[in-house]
Amino acid sequence: MKVVINASTVRIGGGLQATHSFLSECRVLSGNTFHVFLSAKMSALIDRSLYPGNFMFYNIKASSASMQGRRQLRRELSALERRIRPDVVFTIFGPPYWRPQARHICGFAKAQYLYKDSPFFKIITLKQSLLLKLKEHFHISSFKNDCDVLVVETEDVQKLLMQRLPGKPVHTVSNTCHQVFDDENKWSYTVKLPTSNAFTLLTVSACYIHKNLSIIPAVIEYLVKQYPGFAFRFVLTFNAQQLPGVTAMHLPYLHFTGKVDIADCPALYRQADAMFLPTLLECFSVSYAEAMKMDRMVLTSDLSFARNICRNAALYFDPLSSQSIGDAIYKAATDVQLKEQLLHNGRQRLHQFLSAKERAAAYLKIIEACHETGHEGSFYIQEKINING
């Protein structure tokens, strides 16, 4: 079977990591012929010398970042498809902005178009809201008209997306840690935090609006006032200039690492006490699984998407309340029994997620089913599966 893996739309964030993980596993899981379309950012992450002869890579010059770029992208991808004549196209994360002739499977991870009750919509400006609605129109149109089958990462998203796009087949394959977390020989120890006895909260993320990290200065102020003498620090994987509202008063409680590579992350978690994520919108943040994998507490927003993923393996707070967040942080740092319970629950919850290998196998099963049977139903793959059968 000839399969096009379309990663031309993957340019930022966790999509880069997930795509790299999937491609790495495909090297050993499948004998299909893979034609891989790469964005410039994705191409920089791929060591093509590691891939066998059934992989062919194409650097896609056009970008989906503008209307003109999307027109060029459609022409470029269509020309390649005519030459390759694939059986199936799998766009790892959409919207694809392109309708191939072959059967088309596409990943969906646009939480902002489904969780309309999110407090995210309370913190954005009118201009941002109008721009988001415009993007939503074009993005949903592409998912509806350019894709035959959609793939999401949680049951919650599957249910909401099937309501948004009735009649469209939607499959679910859970997100998971990159396979580098499974092999300590591949860990990098270049990012070393200053030695400290402070309770260390780690956030592995860019400073996107929906991550709600701008609340951190207010949380610092609350903790300093409410719990004098409590030693804590936030470790953030971006630059200090990107976090709004920071003054000299906040700096002793902040450490900025700058952008980190995936190989840096396991050792970075080892240097932290908890993973902190006050996010307002997610489909499935891989940070949850990473923290559980590294046996670290999860402190996150009390919102449905977070509870759907973490269940009883996280300490939840109101993400718009600095008091609620601060109290949760202090409780996590001082309640030893709570810590042990959360870590135990995290280890148990982690067993329910797929491994990187199982996730890739699940994607391949969907690709094969769509090619061989034209399967139109929807199903859910989250628990352990038989990757050989």
What annotation goes with each model-predicted range?
Residues 55-56, 244-266:
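Nucleotide-activated donor-binding/catalytic signature segment of Leloir-type glycosyltransferases, i.e.
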Residues 300, 315-323, 331-336:
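Conserved acidic donor-binding segment of nucleotide-sugar-dependent glycosyltransferases
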Residues 77, 81, 267-272:
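Short alpha-helical donor nucleotide-sugar binding micro-motif in glycosyltransferases
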Residues 337-379:
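A charged, aromatic-enriched C-terminal amphipathic alpha-helix characteristic of glycosyltransferases
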Residues 293-300:
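Short hydrophobic beta-strand element within catalytic cores of glycosyltransferases
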Residues 4, 192-211, 217-220:
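Conserved donor-binding/catalytic core segment of Leloir-type glycosyltransferases
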Residues 280:
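Aromatic "clamp/platform" in nucleotide-sugar-dependent glycosyltransferases that forms part
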Residues 128-150:
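Membrane-proximal helix-turn-helix segments that form the acceptor-binding/catalytic region
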